[in-house]
Amino acid sequence: MSNAPREAPAPWPAHAGQRLAAFRAFLAAQGGPALPAQEAEALDAFSLAEPNAFWRALWAFADLPGDPGARDRSSDGTMAGTRFFPDGRVNFTEALLRGPAEALAILARDETGAETRLTRGALRDAVAALAAQLAEGGFGPGDRLCALTPNRPEAVIAALATAALGGTFASCSPDFAPRAVLDRFAPLRPKALLVSDGSRYKGRALPLGETAAQLKAALKPALALSYAVLGTELEGFTPLRRPTPGAGASWRADDRGALDPLYVLFSSGTTGAPKGIIHGTAGPLLQHLKEHQLHCDLGPGDRLLYYTTCGWMMWNWLVSALASGATIGLYDGAPDAPGTGEEDAFLSFAREGAFTHLGTSPAYLTRLAQLGDGDPLPALRVLLSTGAPLPGWAWAFAKKRFGDVPLCSISGGTDLLGCFALGHPERPMEAGALQGRGLAMAMDFDHGDDDGTAGELVCRAPFPSQPLGLIDDPTGERLRATYFPGDPNTWRHGDYGYWTEKGGVVLLGRADAVLNRGGVRMGTAEFYGPLEALPSLADCLIVDRPAG
């Protein structure tokens, strides 16, 4: 695979970018600039030159329930200390729940093929029921709910109910070791704990009863809630309340401050104890609306399925797609579990669920390539990939395997709960490259330029989804040391890459994982291609061993 020719990848179809075109028209109608159609550079330049106007226009374009407030931003004079819409109010839960009651909100399936469907009306009923259950237990603004849960509708319901009451939501997936879960949840001192009785993976039932008991004993939450995946009851936990059909029709969630903490996500913990990263309410939602609608051409009637767990920021990214009127797909289990015919369970779900947008990873696409040919997915419009640099051969393979469907590699992180670089319906598609930077994201490469010289990915201007802070960092000192070392006006992301001549982005891996042998820098991407060509190799470790 590493030596496969880099033939031209499938481009975006001519009719793509409808949401992008609608946003341009909206800008002009609201007194903004009349930007030329199909010219990505003009909109990119406007978003960078006038970020306040761009983000305020996006709020209005998305018709977010709430008010952005009088001020576009507050600042202490640095990027690190800048916050967008400090006076704003937004109803996050309503933004995700609104729409026709009969429209499909969630299509969920596990690796056994068991499926759950929730309309927007049924989802509202479930969120209203859990919000009432939490409120009766004393849960309110400023409280935190921690969830240990597989990727199932109950996780989405819990996040929306928490947001509805002004709380903060954090989650881990069942594949975390008990100690790892406790290391993440304990600093949050949660008021409520939600745990499933277990999960299934590769045909095995994985009970969580013992872990749940350990968490409850250590965290001492005021509310301990559970739901069943394996059909068992957890001792000392109260089951989630069953919703009453139609009861949510007259229920409305509370508005929240745009800068109120909504999510806590966790760093990997590879360089010490995991950091709890606090994200606000409006900023990540605006970032996701931009990425979904303007970059991925996602809107009402579309269906987005991304392979993720509740321990990864892509889960939060996926959930936000409800705000664009899309149906979200939740898959729980091993992606390579047996599916229909010769397909795996994940791909079978993508086909049978008629998903228009499918999110994968380099590892998953590599496995598909090793399996050989297969049938296209008739409903598929956009193929996405993230989690690692995508090898150059993947674009040719995707075109062969899925037909004329654009393959968009996206890259960002937990730290910003969004993307620095991703797809774009109006930019050229290049094998081996992300199409470009996200709108209003002033990303660049430090010591990099257009001739292929690589550098560290940096961002030199504020954006709404910057973290509000870190857990147990009241002065912000750790946050500045982590993301703004040496300069409070430059975000250092740690990725390593360069620009292409067409404005695309090539990422080679993490800057701290780059090897330098005799002045030649080699990132992780340089090793993926040759190693992935060896089907007998299950895993590997690259070590820089000096000669001698």
Please report, for each region that a protein language model flagged, where it lies by residue:
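Conserved AMP-binding/adenylation subdomain of ANL enzymes
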Residues: 285-303, 313-356, 371
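Structural core segment of the AMP-binding/adenylate-forming
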Residues: 164-242, 361-362
